[in-house]
Each structure stands twice: as C-alpha cells, then as structure tokens.
C-alpha cells in the first residue's frame, strides 16, 4: 500500500513532511533546525491504570485521575503536529473519542500508546480508532513476549511494539521483518527509582551487546533519546544510520504535557515543570532548547 502524505508544513527554518507510515522528514537549507512550535508532543491524558507496572515512571494506578481534555492551548495546536497520547491507560478515558475527533478536525496527527494487556480488553475500540483514522500510530508496550501483540503489529503496519531497555529480553521471539519496535530508555523516575536493580543493569548491557545483530531482524528499530544514550547507539552504527533515527534533543522540537496535573516540561523525566498556558507557542518557548 503506497504511503500517504499526511502533513506538509513549515516550522521555523525547516519544512516537515509526515507520512502515513510514520516516516517524518525534516529539511532545511541551514545547518540546524530551529522550531517555531513543537512538531511532536508527548501528551498524558490520564493517570488511571489497572496494571500497576512496577517500573511505571508516571506511578499510574487504579486511583489515578482522568484529565480534562478542554484545556485552551489544545485549540492552538498547529496542523500537522503529532500527539503521542498516553497515560495511564488512555483507552479508559471517557472523553477519548470526542477528543480524537476534535484533534482530527484540527489536522493534528494522533498516536496512542497502550499496555499489551489492554489490547485484548479494548480490541474493538482500538480497531475503531484505526479504521476511523482517529489515530495513525499505535504503540503497544510489552514486558515480555506477547503473541497477540506481535500478530497485531504484523496485521497493522502502523503498530510499533514498545519495549523498555533492561526490562524486555525476548527480542528473538518478537523478531520479524514485518514488525517495528521502539526501544525506550529505562526511566529512574516514579516507581522506576525503587524498581531498578542489578538484574536490570545487567540486561541493559546485554541489550547493548546484541543490538547490532537486531537491526536486520525487524522492519524498523527506533529509540527514544534516553535509550540512545543508555545503549550508546551512536558508537554501534554508522553515522549515516544514526542521523536517520535521531530527531534532535528533547526540547528542540518536542515537549511533554501532563494534562492531569496541568503542567508541561521538556520531557516526562524533567524535574522543571511549568503550569499550563492558553497558547502552545509560549509554552514551547519556555522549555525550548536551541543549539
């Protein structure tokens, strides 16, 4: 199936092309990319979750609250902006559907991250979101091998399996040329502080050792910035390959927004938090990193 161009826009001194398969291309005639607004936002919409994962950096649980999804700044999001929506369990939010419809109407591109165990519980809703094009990318967080999640990823090519460095070990079991994975850095934040142990540290070293052999086993392997650092990916692959997967430092064109606590930051691990404003641009300028 040919990929569709979802968005083409100018952001500061560069042009962004965003395709339906998740490919994002940034082009500039200058040596650096300086954003006028965030082209990607990590958006937390709930702290409710029934999984109680011991490494959860958001400390989500069954007492967690849902956020109000009518914050004024949401209406100021630019067409083509990507939202990586998560929680908690975002599928449990009672206003998820109308919120996604509002974002689609604004031209905002929504992606959703869910826990592997919620794929079965909310399967009909997930399929509805995909078929109605309310979301374009689906991230499924895995702790161990999950047959249903791998099958789903093979059937819906915009699905990415999310695994945490040091936690996930079953790379060979999920390896498939039709599967995309995202390796996330282990966050020593929230419950992740006390859960970290020598076994996790050992597994992080093992993952670093086997990483070069994994690239040919998957359709695509990508990393968040924390994983890039923890695994020292730059030393393991060619500079050309690294430049393909590296999209800039946190805060250059990205930011984190916690709608539950009504605050924003450079990333979800940032200790410097600021209260929400009514417009996305001054919010972004507050945390923006310019090189």
Residue ranges and their predicted role:
Residues 1-43, 252:
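N-terminal [4Fe-4S]-dependent radical SAM core
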Residues 133-281:
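Radical SAM enzyme [4Fe-4S]-AdoMet core and its adjacent flexible, acidic
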């Amino acid at each position: 199936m040919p990929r569709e161009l979802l968005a083409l826009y100018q952001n500061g001194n560069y042009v962004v092309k965003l395709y339906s398969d998740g490919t994002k291309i940034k082009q500039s005639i200058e040596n650096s990319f300086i954003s006028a607004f965030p082209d990607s936002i990590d958006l937390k919409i709930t702290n409710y979750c029934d999984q109680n994962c011991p490494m959860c950096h958001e400390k989500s649980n069954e007492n967690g609250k849902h956020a109000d999804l009518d914050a004024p700044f949401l209406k100021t999001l630019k067409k083509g902006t990507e939202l990586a929506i998560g929680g908690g369990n975002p599928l449990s939010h009672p206003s998820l559907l109308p919120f996604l419809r509002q974002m689609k109407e604004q031209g905002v591109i929504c992606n959703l991250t869910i826990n592997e165990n919620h794929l079965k519980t909310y399967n009909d809703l997930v399929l509805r979101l995909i078929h109605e094009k309310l979301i374009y990318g689906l991230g499924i967080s895995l702790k161990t091998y999950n047959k249903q999640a791998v099958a789903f990823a093979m059937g819906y090519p915009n699905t990415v399996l999310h695994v945490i460095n040091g936690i996930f070990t079953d790379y060979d079991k999920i390896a498939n040329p039709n599967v995309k994975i995202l390796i996330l850095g282990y966050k020593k934040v929230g419950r992740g502080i006390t859960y970290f142990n020598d076994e996790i540290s050992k597994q992080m070293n093992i993952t670093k050792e086997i990483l070069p052999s994994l690239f040919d086993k998957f359709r695509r392997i990508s990393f968040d910035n924390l994983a890039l650092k923890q695994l020292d990916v730059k030393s393991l692959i060619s500079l050309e390959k690294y430049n393909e997967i590296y999209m800039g430092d946190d805060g250059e064109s990205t930011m984190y927004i916690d709608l539950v606590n009504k605050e924003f930051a450079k990333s979800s691990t940032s200790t410097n938090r600021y209260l929400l404003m009514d417009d996305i641009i001054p919010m972004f300028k507050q945390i923006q990193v310019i090189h």
